[in-house]
UniProtKB/Swiss-Prot annotation:
InterPro entries given in the database record: Ribosomal_eL33 (IPR001780), Ribosomal_eL33_sf (IPR038661), Transl_B-barrel_sf (IPR009000)
Gene Ontology BP annotations: translation
Protein name, entry field: Large ribosomal subunit protein eL33
Gene: rpl35ae
A GO-annotated cellular component: ribosome
Presence of keyword Transcription regulation: no
Amino acid sequence: MARARGVVLGYRRGTNTQYPQHALVKLLLDDPRKAGLYVSGIAFYRDRYGNVYKGRVLRLHGRRGGVVVVKFNPPLPGQATGGVVEVVKAGGDG
C-alpha cells in the first residue's frame, strides 16, 4: 500500500467563508504531479494528545503543486496547521 506524508496548509476558504472540515494538504512527493494518485485515499492526523482525525482525499487543489483537499470528520482544529498528515493510497495494489 502506497503511503505519503503531507503538511496541513490550512482550511479551504473563500473571500467571506471558511470551510473547517476541508483541509488543504501539501503532499511531500518526489514528483508533485503524482498527487492525483492519492485522490479517494485516506488521510490520518494525530495530535499531541493522541487523538486521531481521519479524512478522505477529495480532489486536487491547483494544477501542479501537489496540494490536495482532504475532508476530515470531525474537522481538524486550527492548531493542526503545519502538522504532519499521513495519506494512504486507495486500492489494494499500491
